[in-house]
UniProtKB/Swiss-Prot annotation:
The gene is dapA. Pathway: Amino-acid biosynthesis; L-lysine biosynthesis via DAP pathway; (S)-tetrahydrodipicolinate from L-aspartate: step 3/4. InterPro entries: Aldolase_TIM, DapA, DapA-like, Schiff_base-form_aldolases_AS, Schiff_base-form_aldolases_CS. Its EC number is 4.3.3.7. It is found in: Cytoplasm. Coiled coil: none annotated. GO terms for cellular component: cytosol. One of its GO terms (molecular function) is 4-hydroxy-tetrahydrodipicolinate synthase activity. Catalyzes the condensation of (S)-aspartate-beta-semialdehyde [(S)-ASA] and pyruvate to 4-hydroxy-tetrahydrodipicolinate (HTPA). This is 4-hydroxy-tetrahydrodipicolinate synthase. It is an enzyme of class 4 (lyase).
Length: 295
């Protein structure tokens, strides 16, 4: 196993009925993801964790709590990226102080930096932390697409060790994997792209669906890396309907609803996102029961 691992769960953030951070349920969920769903690592305060609506205090509470309670059994990756280099540096320093194992840095959003700006942004942060870094490219959300050349330049920096790639650009993914020759981990940035990314030499996935089908996803990855691509594909086809059903609305609305229904209480999403309707929840649950029948 390399770097952060192969199956990384982008953990949702549990809230109570008042919409506040539910610390006990955060720990409970993290333990389930590691002990029952076979997650090698957890990303905290990412897109799935509703980072835009978490305060800095809530993020640090989450980082420290999960690192203390679960960090002995899984890598804890703190989502510290933002559209401000200064704020990213400040949160990264605090995350390092509480003991996280690595950080995930999304490309700065809204202000649309150039490729040169992106390189300077990430290099500046890498030079001021000892933590290993996963870059996160998700242009549909950020408005900026990190180019192949920028990624390859950044991969030369010692503590930039991985990429979560959610652009769907498989040509870019193939070229980055080929050029870095096994020295840089590339992860599928969404569950639906897991098989093509593995086929190109990718390490694994930063997953949303693994909250409920982590064991299946880990089995797929293990089968593929054991040169049993037929088994991996067959397993993937079984869970594919549930993976696509999670795309019915903006992430993390569907997965939070599914976890509430089939695993444990994690509360509602925070505005400006809103929960699934009863009809949407019923449809999602039917797909889940049908495609993941043993649960």
């Amino acid at each position: 196993m390399r770097g952060f691992g192969e199956l990384i769960t982008a953990m949702i953030t549990p809230f109570n009925k008042q919409g506040e951070l539910a610390t006990e349920n955060c720990v409970k969920l993290a333990k389930k993801l590691v002990n029952e769903q076979n997650s090698d690592a957890l990303v905290l305060s990412g897109t799935t964790g509703e980072s835009p609506t978490l305060s800095t205090e809530e993020k640090l509470t989450l980082f420290q709590l999960i690192t203390e309670k679960v960090g002995g059994n899984a890598n804890i990756i703190a989502g510290t990226g933002s559209y401000s280099t200064k704020e990213t540096l400040e949160l990264t320093k605090k995350a390092e102080e509480v003991g996280v194992h690595g950080i995930m840095l999304v490309t700065p959003y809204y202000n649309k930096p150039t490729q040169g700006d992106l390189y300077k942004h990430f290099k500046t942060i890498a030079q001021k932390t000892s933590l290993p870094i996963m870059l996160y490219n998700v242009p549909k959300r950020t408005g900026v697409d990190m180019s192949q050349d920028t990624i390859l330049k950044l991969a030369e920096i010692d503590n930039i060790i991985a990429l979560k790639e959610a652009s769907g650009d498989f040509n870019k993914i193939a070229n980055v994997i080929r050029e870095t020759r096994g020295e840089f981990d590339v992860y599928s940035g969404d569950d639906i792209s897991l098989m093509p990314v593995l086929s190109l030499g990718g390490t694994g996935v930063v997953s949303v669906a693994s909250h409920l089908i982590g064991k299946e996803l880990k089995e797929i990855i293990d089968a593929y890396h054991a040169n049993n691509s037929r088994k991996a594909l067959e397993l993937f086809q079984e869970i594919y309907p549930f993976i696509t059903a999670l795309l019915v609305k903006t992430n993390p609305i569907p997965i939070k609803a599914a976890v509430n229904t089939h695993l444990m209480q994690v509360g509602s999403v925070r505005p400006p996102l809103y929960d699934l309707s009863e009809k949407e929840l019923e449809q999602l649950s039917e797909v889940y029961k049908w495609s993941v029948g043993k649960y």
